[in-house]
């Protein structure tokens, strides 16, 4: 593999070329064709000639020290998708401005909203009671997310089983609880979710050994190289801090601009309050929150991908890993690739906004007892979730390419997906459960946060929610906070696996030459590795 930016992989390399002295596993037939009986490939299919990446080592390879930028050089222009980076900065600055004004108005009339759970005289909007709820939600999300991260680190196979079972049990128990509380719409939705989780988990069982092996491989590498656990902890704490800031901003917007029918909101004495303004500002800060959270998540992912790429291509070289791989990968993600990371994050943020709107609508229908409406919005939410999964999958493998070679977002996505499809890596990706497992675990944490919000509102009975109008909104935001924090904590776990898959596709011969033990254990656990990845005829 080159130490220089590469837009193409070498289709002539395969996993069937062994070095002398290695035990040669039983040869598999050549599956790399487009015939239906041969995994959808045609025996007569031939790729046109593609330029091979240069094979020379980085300029300082034989010297005492070389860094990440020497190992993975990027071509000019070095900066890509600049418009997305500038737009991201503008949106974030707008968020800072809105937050500052809203929090100032909240602090100015804080007496109306109380200092604790029960002493508020605010009967028209969110208040300090809600702020304390979000503090509890943050603590629960932080504790569950970090415990989940430690579970992945120390109990790889058990981690997958426990995740699936907990989601099933929690979904069914929540559905039964809602029905017992006569919230039939929400109860039926959760029961359907539980049945769906059971079907998914049963289909997972044959693929658990391979997934557990890949997870353990990622964890083993992280213990020896890079700073995965430090990056995860710092990223998680930044996510918690931003979620706290967002929670204060959200409550402040309602306090500052929510009109009161009795005219009791002192913030509205000088005008400027309206329901439309509240909705507009909430939509804006929610979108900014999603975009920042996705950018943070993808920056962590790109950083970790750089570390695993360094391990895959250079750990067995005479001079070992490039010096400062973690710092070098982070520096590239926040400079040359800042625009590309912002672009990919923007797409996910838009989809998440649609899913959030659907979630709020579904909970409103459930609160009003509309079973049909609740189920319809749940089904729509499932389609949006599938779209989110597909785009996220597409994004994360593209970011692995961006981490190493610094290409623009769209060319990197096209090149990476073409390579993975032609190599057969997409088959391995589909059979690896780590992505769905981590998503399911994050959803579990978010449902715990949403349930906490519901119980808190039921037991504290704030005056602003006497008719239950704010229940769906508060639960939805508690769900989002739990989901984003857990996903950010767990990002480094999946990043290693995804980078290994991409690196295997770009240069499979490195796996044979530099990591033979890993390769042989992989084909023992999952023989389809030899069948899925073959050179073209």
UniProtKB/Swiss-Prot annotation:
Residues 23-35 have a biased composition (Low complexity). Pfam families: Choline_transpo (PF04515). It is found in: Cell membrane. Residues 1-81, 152-158, 206-227, 297-333, 392-432, 491-537 are cytoplasmic. Residues 1-16 have a biased composition (Polar residues). The keyword Transport applies. It comes from the Eukaryota. It is a multi-pass membrane protein. InterPro entries: Choline_transptr-like (IPR007603). Glycans are attached at residue 469. GO terms for biological process: transmembrane transport. GO terms for molecular function: transmembrane transporter activity. Keywords: Cell membrane, Glycoprotein, Membrane, Transmembrane, Transmembrane helix, Transport. The keyword Glycoprotein applies. GO terms for cellular component: membrane; plasma membrane. Residues 103-130, 180-184, 249-275, 355-370, 454-469 are extracellular. The chain crosses the membrane at residues 82-102, 131-151, 159-179, 185-205, 228-248, 276-296, 334-354, 371-391, 433-453, 470-490. Residues 1-35 are annotated as: Disordered. Belongs to the CTL (choline transporter-like) family. Probably involved in transport through the plasma membrane. This is Protein pns1. It comes from Aspergillus fumigatus (strain ATCC MYA-4609 / CBS 101355 / FGSC A1100 / Af293) (Neosartorya fumigata). The gene is pns1.
